[in-house]
Amino acid sequence: MPTIQPVLEAAIQLFSQLDSARLEAEVLLSHVLRVKRSYLYTWPNGLLTAHQINQFQALCQRRLQGEPIAYLLGHKEFWSLELQVTPATLIPRPETELLVEQALARLPIQSDAQVVDLGTGSGAIALAIARERPRCRVLATDNAPEALVIAQQNAQRLGLQRIQFRVSDWWQALEQVTAAVVVSNPPYVAITDPHLTQGDVRYEPRNALISGKNGLAAIRLLITQSLVHLEPKGWLLLEHGYNQAAAVQKLLTRQGYAMITTYPDLAGQPRVTVGQKP
């Protein structure tokens, strides 16, 4: 009967063209075996059943076709929270944690403020804020009901009860809502962007990625309709593309926002721009 080490080494060779061949093979095999990665080294001679091998090889083939690891595993870590993800949701990125950081910087520890997360997807941003500011009232919206189902399941599994979820096309279902902080990681990729044919994004929901010819359609709509939904001195925080900061700042300025600032992500790229309602 085959054992762990040769099966793992064969997968690493299969993944030789991937940047993280060993890591990805280990992650997939430990997922199939429902063990931690360290188990693979502690028990290299552990026996594998035919079913386990078939399951592992099927995942490897899907990965070779470019399917994201997060979708193969069914989960992704964000802000130290393990979140369920499916092809109905965007895969949370590390750079989006900057958006959470900047939101928390504007919410005192004991704050019970109203926070709105527009386009929540898997719920990553809303859940991270709710975890760090448990007294805040968090409302998370998305125009995709299937994504909201995943977000709600994540909230329930994590025991985060003070979050409301609502189907809404941006501001559409929020007529009576005003917030101290509004955050959004909206679609901001141009429809002609060549990256759409590369890597993980090929498998992610297009409506969570693409936003018009220059990638600014959703951001423009969010900004131009935002003031009525913010309390006095309230904050709007937006993630955007590395080359969109100037355009986002200009849109905020036109609406009369103050304290407009852009923050870089860990790679040094302009990633989050914020503005305060006068």
Q: Where are the regions a protein language model picked out?
A:
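Conserved SAM/SAH cofactor-binding pocket of Class I
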Residues: 98-195
